[in-house]
Amino acid sequence: NAHPHISQSGKLSLIHNGIIENYKILKTELLCKGFIFKSDTDSEVIVNLIDYYYNLPEIDIDEAIKMATDRLEGTYGLVIQCIDNPLSVYIIRNGSPILVGENENYIIATSEASGFLNQMNNYYVIENNDLVVLSINDGIKTNIIYKPVKTQNVSYALTPDPYEHWTLKEIMDQSHSLLNSLNNGGRIFNTQIKLGGLDYIKSYIDNIVNIIFIGCGTSLNACHIGRIYLKSLSVVNNIQCFDAAEFDMNDIPLSGKTLLVMCSQSGETKDLHRVIQLIKDKPDIITMGVVNVVDSLIAREVDCGIYMNAGREVAVASTKSFTSSLLIFKLFSLWYFQIKTKNINLNKSVIQNIRNINIQIGTINNNIDSLINDTHISLLNAENLFILGKGKMEHIAKETALKMKEICYIHAEGYSGSALKHGPFALLTPDFPVILIIDKENEDKMWNVYKEIESRKANILVISEISNLELDPTKYIIVPENKEIQEILFINVLQHISYKLALKREINPDKPRNLAKVVTVE
């Protein structure tokens, strides 16, 4: 599926981002008209469909593009060039984002603002179905008057130096990224949480009866933990969490004001944007974004939000954006508690634990090679792996399993420790590798799980903040204790384990096969 695709006549070239759902029907129609295809992609169908209309009598390229796109079902962002007008480029979109920026030297069309490479002062967010012409002679020609959006200039590192991979650089960067998430915008003042980006919610907060967290992949795991944070404070009765890809109209509460919390590292995730489109005409729903990329699609379209401020992530597998998401959700839950209960001042120890998290992460990072050794990694180097935790740690287990899949190519599954006996137990055999997360909150129950697994002679690696467990030190990693956000310390260690295991398996962790950093298609 290399781009650009060229039409059969050779007159048109096209770049496409998205998925066309009815491309097989259109392809069959074109085959009957004598078109020959070089690939099985929906993109080649689009360029040949435009070509078909362009070759009809008295149809110009603008009309041909509109006639073709009117027949497309699905999402697309198209950039088209015609040999008869080589000084112009045509763009049109439906559902898939396109941004256009211009300066005195050139014009850039991109799917996200980072594509401008700090070369533009302003850009335009192209609307669905507006055919835009970019011309060397005439600049940008649109059918809609657009309001310019100011670009945010960001300093980008070009290499992961001094580290071998971006994945490791971003894991090690978490002491700084968490500090940025905590401090940018002055989010803690004495014993109060200040989240100016959520002022919109304040006037509705007494009427909100439903809160729904929505995300995909790593962000979904963060959402589950965010739900637990808020649920533990007993300020809202109905708190749910959904995978954005599975959310539909039937999941919208039947009554009452609803706050929809949407989490996305890129701010461009197609499945989340689909949810925004789904509920945009529902007056009882308030949308809130937790995103990392400033001025991204989701950030622009929600009612209010909080930026993660984790900094740019290059590696496909999310690391620092996950821990920043957890920190933001912790701040959000405490902020919501303050506003809802009018209990403005929080316990000083709560604030101190939150403030200490970046220092504790720094301590782990500085001592990681003594904390995790070759014996630990060899223990886990297998084709199958279980990771078990309870409460919030169940979702840390699931996030670890995702990392093991992404960068180690291991069939890893994360479960609640209590779920093991409901089926996964049947897969346990001698030497089967299991990571067990034993936190203080669930120590007794997880210790019972340990004994059950040990009796099956599985290979167990325990991660815990409890320093006095009677365990073989070669199968036991102790992390610092944080009574408010212990899960961030656990996942930091588990990210390091995933990275080291990827290297042992001779896999480049920065670029997992078949995966993309930003998922802009359903």
Predicted regions and their residues:
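A residue-level signal for conserved active-site and pocket-lining positions in enzyme catalytic cores
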Residues: 18, 46, 78, 95, ...
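Active-site phosphate/pyrophosphate-binding segments
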Residues: 174-178, 182-212, 304-435, 443, ...
